[in-house]
């Protein structure tokens, strides 16, 4: 049957059709090859925007650095990074005037966090540049390697596990004349395989010690590794993102904690909230502007876009902001917070893997590592690459480019939001002192600006003033990409507003479908996604019912678990049919065991096992949920698990789903081949961390989790906890005297062992 697609939209208001224009179905584009070219683009662009700044040379590393702060005022609309210090400080002062005590209170909150945060905070996060191996590693491993090397060099402040002590080590490490590090190297040798008698190449990974001179160490500590951002939709060109090393991470964390605390108190900030909370904040600002624009005033909204936000921001400006925000605070606190921007003013961008060359007849492939780009003959490269390399050469040191201006993506989202909000704050009538005034929203580099004025000229004047104010703070509103509408229709962080928010359903499309964790989790996540979209995204009952049927179909094809009475033949159908035939109550079988689907849109909140429990045969119940069954996952499954779902923009978000432990909640085993590589030690470390953390959680269930006070090791904390719990259990009669004695004996043994060690 042919359907004329326009018919679908006859009943739909135009704004609701927005979701059909989004590039969110199908696989997103991924990058291949190296990010070297993209990184060079970033470095060169950043310097171009600030080209009229002052050049200096870093005394420690010898890197040339460009400082655009207080540079020339713009004469045209081209993007520039010349922020004016006095303007930024004044904007901060006005922000504080409008919100009395905001900086003071945020500083106090942050101070508390600084004193309490443990160093394991740095194990969160994905890939981190590991300066000891000069490549990316999982965060926990990179931290472990850093601490190991610090110990090797006599730095032990981090033993107590406070992040602030680890940061003291970082500062001390910068003063050392040389640092000894442990790094890996590969040995290849040909050996005869016993089984097949063929020759094979065996790779062994050795660890060797190496000394780094002060200059080399400081360069590594200031290095951000770069990669290509993957899975970005709606873009033709890829772009580079950065991952900092462990020396920078902790300092950034504290700065962002302070900035987050400030953002939480600002009604114009789109961070750190999200989802419905963000929509409510937004709606409030719009309501305020609409209500105040009585019949006498016009109100217009700009859906704003800034040109190259990161590349025009400047760490020196952030330093000025922090200096102002913390001006009445203790010296140590001000120092800790000012280190991150100082390190970023001296950062180096690693150029990644370098370039791959292939000879015409495809026989030879060779890689030119980034380290060689400073000296190689340029005739091998095409024109555009040659230009890039020529431009970047003066900035290169050991395969990294000196990049003083600019911020790299996603490093100081909160702090840059504070800067943006400070301009929105200046739009109040008492500050503009004219007929026009403005307000709006800021979320990192995205903004919406609402301008009110008696007439069109006033609106234009207000927009111009906003634009110029932004320029003074190093923010470049793009006149080409921003557009203006009557207030009531605009877009902000992919939320579309038209007299209220329009559900942009296409954004959620990537999270529908089978996640591929295991049969139990996938069923649960699938129905939870549908449920959540009915609540939050205008997914109507008919569409939800259809989504559910499609999901069940998808699920059955993924796990080859078609109904027991189906004609479809798969590898599992023989077993499933056998089970179907010997089951009395067929409705009780889980979908993954060939049972029927009992879900409809009314019962999506109930886990499948619970939904069907009463319908199950007794022996099926026993097999499915028997903890003695070796196939029932022995991990203690919390009643709520977290899945990672991919919304179309922003980071992957976690979503809670109900988890019931059955034979279907298996955890796949790791691929064995990792055990023969350099990663093996890392894997063992990871497992050890995991075991220690699990054990610790057993002693301190989240409900009673108090941070161990004072400087006690994990073991000491657990032993003292065990003693307290045992005493309470003994006195209340929950355990016998013998058990109590046994526990006390074990605790003493552990302490003796620690003393001997």
From Swiss-Prot:
Swiss-Prot/TrEMBL keywords: Eukaryotic host gene expression shutoff by virus, Eukaryotic host transcription shutoff by virus, Host cytoplasm, Host gene expression shutoff by virus, Host nucleus, Host-virus interaction, Inhibition of host RNA polymerase II by virus, Nucleotide-binding, Nucleotidyltransferase, Phosphoprotein, RNA-directed RNA polymerase, Transferase, Viral RNA replication, Viral transcription
GO molecular function: nucleotide binding; RNA binding; RNA-directed RNA polymerase activity
Pfam families: Flu_PB1 (PF00602)
Segments for region (Promoter-binding site): 249-256
Domain (RdRp catalytic): residue spans on this chain: 286-483
Subcellular location, record wording: Host nucleus; Host cytoplasm
Modifications after synthesis and translation: Phosphorylated by host PRKCA.
InterPro entries recorded: RNA-dir_pol_NSvirus, RNA_pol_PB1_influenza
Function: RNA-dependent RNA polymerase which is responsible for replication and transcription of virus RNA segments. The transcription of viral mRNAs occurs by a unique mechanism called cap-snatching. 5' methylated caps of cellular mRNAs are cleaved after 10-13 nucleotides by PA. In turn, these short capped RNAs are used as primers by PB1 for transcription of viral mRNAs. During virus replication, PB1 initiates RNA synthesis and copy vRNA into complementary RNA (cRNA) which in turn serves as a template for the production of more vRNAs.
Family the UniProt entry places it in: Belongs to the influenza viruses polymerase PB1 family.
Subunit structure: Influenza RNA polymerase is composed of three subunits: PB1, PB2 and PA. Interacts (via N-terminus) with PA (via C-terminus). Interacts (via C-terminus) with PB2 (via N-terminus); this interaction is essential for transcription initiation. Interacts (via C-terminus) with human PKP2 (via N-terminus); the interaction competitively inhibits the interaction between the RNA polymerase subunits PB1 and PB2.
Protein name (database record): RNA-directed RNA polymerase catalytic subunit
């Amino acid at each position: 049957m042919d359907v004329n697609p326009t018919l679908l939209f006859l009943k739909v208001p135009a704004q609701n059709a927005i979701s059909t224009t989004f590039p969110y179905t199908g696989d997103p584009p991924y990058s291949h090859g190296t990010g070297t070219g993209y990184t060079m683009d970033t470095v060169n662009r950043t310097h171009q925007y600030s080209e009229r700044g002052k050049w200096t040379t870093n005394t420690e590393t010898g890197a040339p650095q460009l400082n655009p702060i207080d540079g020339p005022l713009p004469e045209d609309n081209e993007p520039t990074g010349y922020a004016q210090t006095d303007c930024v400080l004044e904007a901060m002062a006005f922000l504080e005037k409008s919100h009395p005590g905001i900086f003071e209170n945020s500083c106090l909150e942050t101070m508390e966090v600084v004193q309490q945060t443990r160093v394991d905070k740095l194990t969160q996060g994905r890939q981190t540049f590991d300066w000891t191996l000069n490549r990316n590693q999982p965060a926990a491993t990179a931290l472990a390697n850093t601490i190991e090397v610090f110990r090797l060099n006599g730095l032990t402040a981090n033993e107590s596990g406070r992040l602030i002590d680890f940061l003291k080590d970082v500062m001390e490490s910068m003063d050392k004349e040389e640092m000894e590090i442990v790094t890996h190297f590969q040995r290849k040798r040909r050996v005869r395989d016993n089984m097949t008698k063929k020759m094979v190449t065996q790779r062994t990974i050795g660890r060797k010690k190496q000394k780094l001179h002060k200059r080399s160490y400081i360069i590594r500590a200031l290095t951000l590794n770069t990669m290509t951002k993957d899975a970005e939709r709606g873009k033709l060109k890829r772009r580079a993102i950065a991952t900092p090393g462990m020396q920078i991470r902790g300092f950034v964390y504290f700065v962002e904690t302070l900035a987050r605390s400030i953002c939480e108190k600002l009604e114009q900030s789109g961070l750190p909230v999200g989802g419905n909370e963000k929509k409510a904040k937004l709606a409030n600002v719009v309501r305020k502007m609409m209500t105040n624009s009585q019949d006498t005033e016009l109100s217009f909204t700009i859906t704003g876009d800034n040109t190259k936000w990161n590349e025009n921001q400047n760490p020196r400006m952030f330093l000025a902001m922090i200096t102002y925000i913390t001006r009445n605070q203790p010296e140590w606190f001000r120092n800790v917070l000012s280190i991150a921007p100082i390190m970023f003013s001296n950062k180096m961008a690693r150029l990644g893997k370098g370039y791959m060359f292939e000879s015409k007849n495809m026989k030879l492939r060779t890689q030119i590592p980034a380290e060689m780009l400073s000296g190689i003959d340029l005739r091998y490269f095409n024109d555009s690459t040659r230009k890039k390399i020529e431009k970047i050469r003066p900035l290169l040191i050991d395969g990294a480019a000196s990049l003083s201006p600019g911020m790299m993506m996603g490093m100081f989202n909160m702090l840059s939001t504070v800067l943006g909000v400070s301009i929105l704050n200046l739009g109040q009538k008492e500050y503009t002192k004219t007929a026009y005034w403005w307000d709006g929203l800021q979320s990192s580099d995205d903004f919406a600006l609402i301008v009110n004025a008696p007439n069109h000229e006033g609106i234009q004047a207000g927009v111009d003033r906003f634009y110029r104010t932004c320029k003074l703070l190093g923010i470049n509103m793009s006149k080409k990409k921003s557009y203006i509408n009557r207030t009531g229709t605009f877009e902000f962080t992919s939320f579309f507003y038209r007299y209220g928010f329009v559900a942009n359903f296409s954004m959620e499309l990537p999270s529908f479908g089978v996640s591929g964790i295991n049969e139990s989790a996938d069923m649960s996540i699938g129905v939870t996604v549908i449920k959540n979209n009915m609540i939050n995204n205008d997914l109507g009952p008919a569409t939800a019912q259809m989504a559910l049927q499609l999901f069940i179909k998808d699920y059955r094809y993924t796990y080859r678990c078609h109904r027991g009475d189906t004609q479809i033949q798969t590898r599992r159908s023989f077993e499933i049919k056998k089970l179907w035939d010997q089951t009395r109550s067929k409705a009780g079988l889980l979908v993954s065991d060939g049972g029927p689907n009992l879900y409809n849109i009314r019962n999506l909140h109930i886990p499948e096992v619970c939904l069907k429990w009463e319908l199950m045969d007794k022996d099926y119940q026993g097999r499915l949920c028997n903890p003695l069954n070796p196939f029932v996952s022995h991990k203690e499954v919390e009643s709520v698990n977290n899945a990672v779902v991919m919304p179309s923009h922003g980071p992957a978000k976690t979503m809670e789903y109900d988890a019931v432990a059955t034979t279907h909640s298996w955890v796949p085993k790791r691929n064995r081949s990792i055990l023969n590589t350099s990663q093996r030690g890392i894997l063992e470390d990871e497992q050890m961390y995991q075991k220690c953390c699990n054990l610790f959680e057993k002693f301190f269930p989240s409900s009673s989790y108090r941070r161990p006070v004072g400087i006690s090791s994990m073991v000491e904390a657990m032993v003292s906890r065990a003693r307290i719990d045992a005493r309470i259990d003994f006195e209340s009669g929950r355990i016998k005297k013998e058990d109590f004695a046994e526990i006390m004996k074990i605790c003493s043994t552990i302490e003796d062992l620690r003393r001997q060690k």
